[in-house]
Amino acid sequence: GELVLAALDAGARRLVIGLGGSATNDGGAGMLAALGVRFLDARGRPVATTPTGLAHLASLDVGGLDPRLADVEVQAACDVDSPLLGPRGASAVFGPQKGATAQQVMLLDTLLTRLSALSGTRGVALASEPGAGAAGGLGWAILTFLGGRMRSGVDLVIEATGLREALTGATAVLTGEGAADAQTLTGKTAAGVAAAARERGVPVVVFAGRIADDAR
């Protein structure tokens, strides 16, 4: 949220927000708070955008959301298709990676369910969108409150770098991945680069720190 504000202050008209590598699972509440959304308990008092605070959440006040966002194109770069809630959602899939126990995962999913319910019918509907659960639910907040849209992260990078044009006349492409496994094939950079190269019949070599059996 603070980075988005800084970009707005700098006059940015197009924002690309990378989703991944987050240590949070708050449904984007922290970002939204920085952008002017208020999170309130049953008495109308502000609550913290932490699991403890969100446990008391009763309403959202979006009246203070930075109005400049209405004139800015927002894209979310994402390489996962997880929804916000449920067994494939932000809490269940990524919570354990961030240290959450099974009991905490259930609590986090309950909190995100409440958050989406309080956001209105649009927020409830967007909770099932692919990528809504990315970065602890930040994807959902971008879709719901910032009017953003999801884009494949690797597609955005390919466009920005002009990779497809650079492939013309290439004899080979070298790319890399920390761990080449089944997840690599679900939208990771190496898979996207390989797909772009395959369109032009250019062979690809992937360097990886580890190659799992399910990558073959």
Language model: regions and residue ranges:
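N-terminal loops that bind phosphate or other acidic moieties
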Residues: G1-L19, A23-R216
